[in-house]
Amino acid sequence: MSKPVITRFAPSPTGYLHIGGARTALFNWLYAKHCGGKMLLRIEDTDRERSTEAATAAILDGLTWLGLDWDGEAISQFERAPRHREVAEELVANGKAYYCYASPEELEEMREKARAEGRPPRYDGRWRDRDPSEAPAGVKPVIRIKAPRDGETVVHDAVQGDVRFPNKDLDDFIILRSDGTPTYMHAVVVDDHDMGVTHIIRGGDHLTNAARQTIIYNAMGWDVPQMSHISLIHGADGAKLSKRHGALGVDAYRAMGYLPAALRNYLVRLGWSHGDDEIMSTEQMIEWFDVKDINKGAARFDFQKLEAINGLYMRSSDDQALFDALVAVLPEIEGGKELAEALDDKGRAQLLLAMPGLKERAKTLVELADGAKFIFASRPLALDEKAASLLNDEGRAVLKPVYPVLEAVGEWTAESLDAAIRAHAEAEGLKLGKIAQPLRAALTGRATSPGVFDVLVVLGREESLARIGDQIG
């Protein structure tokens, strides 16, 4: 019987959860779910100078917001240092690693010699077979792995295929420093083995590490997990992803008003696809996702595509769910604090009532919040440039007779208001747009908004008439 699939996401807490890391987490999560397995979380916090608790919290928060739940407690790599030392010492005892007493001066000499000979710098193995009794007094050694010198190390990769590394290029690298702390290369292998990880899905920049890690697995006689190294994300112009392309933290995407489900949908298609399907539910992603279908080539990040997908998700969202998502993100978006303060019971009811019209015109929650500002605007309304041009003398003249028409409407519903304005337009020989445009400007201070009859209903009779009255004098 085959082992249950266990994947892991192993970020370093030196900053936010960036978009590449979020995609890696998503792929690990989906594959674990697809196989009925588990995704574990390990915080690779061995770099004590750069690792921070705030960064760890930001990563956990980002994963939670994205809906990527992990199994069990998050594991701290730093706290496992005694186990890493134990395995390094075991490798020495078994003749698979050795103590190296080479001084910094000797190592620099090796580097200089390699440079002079046009070779990449490599440790020359001078302590590989020496008797430790020859060790200089008072020098704390490092532990180096005894890497094979002949042949090649092959990484069997589900995405990249078999990748071969000549062993002459892989020197006896350090697994334990002289202060007793493990190197990243060593700690990762010990942790993945002890956690029972069966499948490693990570960025292609780790492919060279995979060769060295395979050497440690083989030295310990452990099974090597199935590796999948995914190509990095590039910008739309094909260059390496940078902040201008979208290499931001997940928290930034949240503050820009993207929905987690939409971001998941966009990220899953960066390097993986299922036929021509663009929009897919989480259940479909889980059913369809397989590492063998991940593309070798680099994916390109496209903000416009993300916006389009987010807009689709917003339009298909339940009004209450979208309202809740907006309220949750208000503290983080520009102008959101003022909007949040205006949300008393009446304001909440108005915003929910406006949601069907607002979501049709917004691609992000930020745009949704901006579109909703008219509800809470103070009188007299500040007019934007286009609204002011619509409320010129001609616009006000068109609007003046509309006031008594609206005042006389019995039932304040979109249908009744529509019928009354259309009848007035017909009687005056005007097209509906000729009335709707200055009316919208008077009600919202803008030239664009949800449907003008929906706006009248959301504002209510009293506020609507008052705003029109402000403009016609």
UniProtKB/Swiss-Prot annotation:
EC numbers for this chain: 6.1.1.17
A cellular component term, taken from the record's GO annotations: cytosol
Swiss-Prot/TrEMBL keywords: Aminoacyl-tRNA synthetase, ATP-binding, Cytoplasm, Ligase, Nucleotide-binding, Protein biosynthesis
Binding site for ATP: K243
Composition skew (Basic and acidic residues), residue ranges: 113-133
Region listing for Disordered, in residue ranges: 113-136
Recorded GO MF terms: ATP binding; glutamate-tRNA ligase activity; tRNA binding; zinc ion binding
Span(s) of short sequence motif 'HIGH' region: 11-21
Pfam families to which the protein is assigned, alphabetical: Anticodon_2, tRNA-synt_1c
Protein localization: Cytoplasm
Family affiliation: Belongs to the class-I aminoacyl-tRNA synthetase family. Glutamate--tRNA ligase type 1 subfamily.
Function: Catalyzes the attachment of glutamate to tRNA(Glu) in a two-step reaction: glutamate is first activated by ATP to form Glu-AMP and then transferred to the acceptor end of tRNA(Glu).
Subunit structure: Monomer.
HAMAP family associated with the record: Glu_tRNA_synth_type1
Record's protein name: Glutamate--tRNA ligase 2
Originating organism: Brucella suis biovar 1 (strain 1330)
Gene field: gltX2
